[in-house]
């Protein structure tokens, strides 16, 4: 009897077959995969007007939970891999206690609290930085966009009359 597939090796002592797969993707296909994260950021930008005065929003642009939103409405908001963090970022690239977002003198600061991989604002490493609307904060593999609402005491443009 002749073997029909001479190129395939068979282990005579086992019925296991090993199959390996290689995937190749077009660059435009990969950019389509990023589209939902970008769309989520755009919808968050349009919803920023509804934020309470003195608060801000962090939107995950890249990372395992892209599109997630975190409201910054406390004096200090912690971010890290520890389950007790206000912003829980579950990935090994994030330290247990990675960074804090602090509201001081009507502006938000991000402070690295001794993380292993560092905290970045607009791709620059920082120990502490004042955040401006649209800044990108990187914590581990997560990239978050910082969006501000109206500042405390600012008029939102609405009138009190009919």
From Swiss-Prot:
GO terms for biological process: negative regulation of glycolytic process; regulation of cellular respiration. One of its GO terms (molecular function) is molecular function inhibitor activity. The modification Phosphothreonine is found at residues 21-22. PROSITE patterns: FHA_DOMAIN. Keywords: Acetylation, Phosphoprotein. GO terms for cellular component: extracellular region; peptidoglycan-based cell wall; plasma membrane. Phosphorylated on Thr-22 by PknB. Phosphorylated on Thr-21 by PknG. Phosphorylation at either Thr-21 or Thr-22 prevents binding to target enzymes. Phosphorylation at these two threonines is mutually exclusive in vitro. Could also be phosphorylated by PknD, PknE and PknF. The modification N-acetylthreonine is found at residue 2. Phosphorylation triggers an intra-molecular protein closure, which blocks the FHA binding site and interaction with target enzymes, and switches off the regulatory function of GarA. It holds the Pfam family FHA. InterPro entries: Cell_Proc_Reg/RNA_Proc, FHA_dom, SMAD_FHA_dom_sf. Monomer. Binds via its FHA domain to Kgd, Gdh, GltB, PknB, and the N-terminal region of PknG. Involved in regulation of glutamate metabolism. Acts as a phosphorylation-dependent molecular switch that modulates the activities of Kgd, Gdh and GltB. This is Glycogen accumulation regulator GarA. It comes from Mycobacterium tuberculosis (strain ATCC 25618 / H37Rv). The lineage of its organism: Bacteria, Bacillati, Actinomycetota, Actinomycetes, Mycobacteriales. The gene is garA.
